[in-house]
Regions:
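Signature of the SF2 helicase/ATPase Hel1-core->accessory helical subdomain module
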Residues: 95, 111, 116-119, 199-200, ...
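A substrate-engagement module of RecA-like helicase motors
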Residues: 2-48, 98-226, 233, 288, ...
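Walker A/P-loop NTP-binding motif
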Residues: 66-67, 86-99, 116-120
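A contiguous, basic/glycine-rich beta-loop/short-helix subdomain that forms a polymer-engagement track
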Residues: 193-228, 239-247, 361-484, 491-498, ...
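Conserved RecA-like P-loop NTPase helicase motor core
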Residues: 481-491, 544-650
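Conserved helicase motor "Helicase C" RecA-like lobe of SF1/SF2 P-loop NTPases
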Residues: 516-545
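Conserved RecA-like ASCE P-loop NTPase motor core of nucleic-acid helicases/translocases
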Residues: 100-106, 438-439, 509-516, 520, ...
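Conserved pre-motif I regulatory segment
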Residues: 25-77
Length: 687
């Protein structure tokens, strides 16, 4: 090549370098202008609401999302309550015309997007967009297993038998097979695993109901749609197992949006690891007995094989519970237990070996009759996978992974998982180019949103923080009682109940009490009932665990003259706008439990890096949880209320300033008299 041609090549490359950003800028401008016009006072979105007015924070976020889509970049957005983040990401995605995947943490938001928000926007924008909703297998009715359940006639209780009859009637008319269509059917109902499939027991194309399969239809519709709504669990389950239909979808997706992104890392950690639990053994035993009696009666002692699995499951739970079982301690939730303490106990290795042997016997029996029915091939695969897991848990974990044991009233589960999702997300970001958008109302308490971006592997993503348009200074008060008992004081929970009763009495209910532990929840709820009874107040106390979450919330909405006491699941995802909720009390600062095995492993990693684990982890986690809990109070621009944090460390410790800074800018009150005066003003305004 000559010198002249070298110069010509250099000129051409220079021109290309200049042209690419110009072309990208033009694309940016085109989509950004369309988005801006959509949000204009005379734009299509105004047709959705007679009182519509543009919101600057919403427009700011929508423009950032439009840029990320045009440039196929990663964007992380923390958008305060009231910004309207859902429309801020959906409008640019729809107007871009690109294939979009939207993922949520909860099925409730997933349903809201698919059933309400997206149809409204599509109508307003007049865009013929095909939508699809894709959930995990357990959300759909399996026709094959429903028929099996009727034939076997074995149910955990009478209620399950009645539920099956109702499901059979519904099966005749449902198009989607989504259990969410069945009002009153709790997603934790014991009938659901009986009439839904799992990756392990699905027969695939060998199933006689394959053509009518609801899971297959949902995945087919997702492959044909321009916008698909999934959830985080489904997304990560697919990265791990490649069994949910998302893997086939992702390569063709050009925009991936994750709402409720603050739950993304924990969802990923659950699914990127491995688990072996007593419930898996019991489920296998139930299916084994049903299939054995249906297709190979007399060929093997199916009842004996099931009994062996049940014994192994029972022994596994007992050895995992250890002294908790002998002490007769009643479990109300799930306990996370350290691996080394339990694995080093006498009998643990023997229990794992018993699981291995029971599964080996099942595998031998099933292989002998595997040609009798397609179900036996799946049973063999399940038995082999569980047997291999029992072998793996008997040796050291993979480098960089952490192990623990989940113990519940119903069973035990051995878990091995990575410490975060950074490696998995980096692999996705390095795949086919696409825009990645991650958003939530709470993603960090610093400018880089490092609480979220570090464990998610998004340190290089563009970061945007959009504040709430609400006037918190005028509409909300923050009360941190000075001189209050410390959380370590035995009388702390009782003092929380006493203060909550006085404040709730001023409002005649309309109060949430959020606790950090189930023990405090019980103490506070009991204390409130006692105080209200003594005073002759007709204020109801609604307690988490007394009924399903959505039932309790509906009772609170129907009767605001009540106090709802809830723990972890009530700190977020609860929306009570208006004057039905005007006071939120938090019992103490929500630091993560230091003895949690996952917390311990993360702390060790930070310390090995020479970092301050208390500042970089514990305070950061507490700030996020505190912000989530406080977010229950003000849900609309006209809401007013009082936030109370019953922890003197919030006012007295140096880190208290950082935690207060993580909250919306509420006006502080100095003492209970001022707090009561504010509540009296709110009560008077209701009339």
């Amino acid at each position: 090549m000559t010198a002249g041609s070298d110069a010509g090549l250099d000129d051409w490359l220079d021109a290309l370098d200049q042209a690419e950003p110009l072309a990208r800028s033009a694309g940016d401008d085109e989509l950004a202008q369309s988005v801006r016009a959509a949000f204009d006072i005379g734009g299509p979105l105004a047709r959705l609401d007679a009182g519509y007015k543009p919101r600057e924070p919403q427009l700011q976020m929508s423009q950032a999302v439009a840029r990320a889509i045009s440039r196929q970049q990663a964007l992380v957005v923390e958008a305060g309550t009231g910004v309207g983040k859902t429309f801020a990401y959906l409008v640019p995605a729809l107007l871009s015309g690109r294939r979009t995947l939207v993922s949520t943490a909860t099925k409730s938001l997933q349903d809201q997007l698919y059933l309400r928000d997206l149809p409204r926007l599509i109508e307003a924008l007049q865009m013929p967009v095909r939508l699809a909703l894709l959930k995990g297998r357990s959300s759909y009715l399996c026709l094959h297993r429903m028929k099996q359940a009727r034939v076997s006639g074995e149910f955990p209780d009478r209620r399950s038998a009645l539920a099956l009859a109702r499901i059979e009637r519904w099966a005749q008319i449902t198009r989607s097979g989504d259990f969410a269509e069945l009002d009153g059917l709790d997603e934790r109902a014991p009938i659901i695993p009986i009439v839904s499939s799992s990756r392990e027991n699905c027969l695939g194309q060998d199933c006689e109901d394959w053509r009518a399969c609801h899971v297959v239809k949902a995945r087919r519709e997702a492959m044909e749609a321009e916008v698909v709504v999934v959830n985080h669990h489904l997304f990560f389950a697919d990265l791990s197992l490649r069994d949910t239909g998302v893997a086939e979808l992702l390569p063709s997706v050009e925009v991936a949006i994750f709402d409720e992104a603050h739950q993304l890392a924990e969802a990923g950690v659950q699914f990127l690891g491995h688990t072996l639990g007593s419930s898996q053994l019991l489920d296998l035993g139930r299916d084994l007995l049903a299939q054995g009696l249906a297709h190979a009666r007399g060929a093997r002692d199916w009842q004996g094989l099931q009994n062996g699995l049940e014994r192994a499951a029972r022994e596994l739970r007992l050895v995992c519970a250890g002294s908790l079982a002998t002490a007769g301690r009643e479990l109300r939730g799930t306990l996370k237990l350290g691996w080394r303490e339990r694995a080093g106990q006498p009998g643990f290795g023997e229990a794992l070996q018993a699981v291995h042997e029971a599964l080996a016997q099942v595998l031998e029996g099933v292989i002998a009759v595997r040609d009798a029915a397609p179900d036996f091939a799946r049973l063999a695969e399940r038995a082999q996978q569980l047997r291999d897991l029992a072998r793996d848990f008997a040796v050291e974990p993979a480098p960089g992974d952490v192990r623990w044991i989940d113990l519940s009233p119903f069973g035990a589960r051995l878990v091995e998982s990575p410490l975060d999702i950074s490696e998995a997300m980096q692999q996705q970001l390095q795949g086919p180019p696409k825009a990645w958008v991650f958003t939530s109302a709470t993603l960090g308490d610093d400018a880089q949103l490092s609480w979220f971006t570090e464990p998610a592997g998004l340190a290089d993503a563009e970061v945007l923080r959009v504040g709430s348009p609400f006037d918190y200074a005028a509409h909300a008060r923050l009360y941190v009682p000075r001189g209050f008992p410390k959380p370590s004081d035995p009388g702390h929970a009782g003092s929380v109940a006493l203060l909550a009763s006085r404040l709730a009495r001023r409002l005649n209910g309309r109060t949430f009490v959020l606790t950090t532990t189930l023990r405090n929840l019980q103490t506070v709820a009991d204390g409130l009932r006692e105080r209200f009874e003594e005073a002759g107040d007709a204020i109801a106390v609604l307690q988490q665990g007394a009924a399903p979450k959505r039932v309790l919330l509906q009772r609170f909405l129907d009767n605001p003259d009540s106090v709802l006491v809830g723990s972890a699941s009530f700190w977020e995802g609860i929306d009570v706008p208006g004057d039905a909720l005007q006071c939120v009390l938090i019992d103490k600062l929500p630091f993560p439990p230091p003895n949690d095995p996952l917390v311990e492993a993360r702390v060790k990693r930070l310390e090995a890096q020479g970092r301050n684990a208390f500042s970089d982890y514990f305070i950061a986690e507490a700030a996020i949880a505190l912000k989530q809990g406080a977010g229950r109070l003000i849900r609309t621009e006209t809401d007013r209320g009082l936030l109370v944090v019953c922890d003197p460390r919030m006012a007295g410790m140096n880190y208290g300033r950082r935690l207060r800074g993580a909250l919306p800018p509420m006006t502080p009150v100095a003492n209970e008299d001022e707090a009561q005066a504010w509540l009296a003003e709110l009560a008077a305004a209701r009339g």
